[in-house]
Amino acid sequence: MPNLLHVDASLAQEGSTSRSLAATYIDAWRAAHPDGTVTYRDLALTPPPHLDWATLSAAFTPPEQHTPEQTEGVKLREELIGELEAADELLLSLPMYNYSVPSTFKAWVDQVILVGRTLQQPPAESVLTGDRVTVIATQGGSYGVGTPKEGWDHQLPFIAHVLESLGATDVELVRVEMTLAPVNPALADFTDVYERSRAAGESALRARAAA
């Protein structure tokens, strides 16, 4: 029975492109895997805390020597890591905020990366080895070659490096750009770019989920 872990990060509970695209994927995935289960983690509604010294140091301290602060920190970290370890497939739906990923996603990454457990050397033995990973990355503008903000995209490189370090090789990235065009008059001329990008993204997600 396949288990899909879906990690959501958009602050917007309504009108979010990344959430809407994720729903498209989940619907198609459930249809293709009627016996499958979906574990859902909403980083906006329940933001993980930034990794602190007590939690970090607990990983290198015998459990019987943990302070109350370390014990409390480890509890949530174990929950997050456990969800990742139990998954056969990972879906990340991530908007771009200020040219990078949401800070809640960075906090989640810091919590689940644990050297010697989720991150091994070589990476081919890490937690995502053998898992399918699908990334939905939405961007309000466009940051490709030849655009005014070419080189400003710190979202996709970060995601790619994190997934590689965790051993992921079966990765499909679905990027939808110019998501602000329908709501920002200054970008209205690019609405067609958004619509084409979104349509292509939805098609790719349905195909990926059904595969």
Curated annotation (Swiss-Prot):
SUPFAM superfamilies: Flavoproteins. Its cofactor is FMN. Keywords: Flavoprotein, FMN, NAD, Oxidoreductase. Its EC number is 1.6.5.-, 1.7.1.17. The keyword NAD applies. GO terms for molecular function: electron transfer activity; FMN binding; oxidoreductase activity, acting on NAD(P)H as acceptor; oxidoreductase activity, acting on NAD(P)H, quinone or similar compound as acceptor. FMN binds at residues 10, 16-18, 138-141. It catalyses: 2 a quinone + NADH + H(+) = 2 a 1,4-benzosemiquinone + NAD(+); N,N-dimethyl-1,4-phenylenediamine + anthranilate + 2 NAD(+) = 2-(4-dimethylaminophenyl)diazenylbenzoate + 2 NADH + 2 H(+). Binds 1 FMN per subunit. It is an enzyme of class 1 (oxidoreductase). Belongs to the azoreductase type 1 family. HAMAP family: Azoreductase_type1. Quinone reductase that provides resistance to thiol-specific stress caused by electrophilic quinones. Also exhibits azoreductase activity. Catalyzes the reductive cleavage of the azo bond in aromatic azo compounds to the corresponding amines. Homodimer. This is FMN-dependent NADH:quinone oxidoreductase. It comes from Frankia alni (strain DSM 45986 / CECT 9034 / ACN14a).
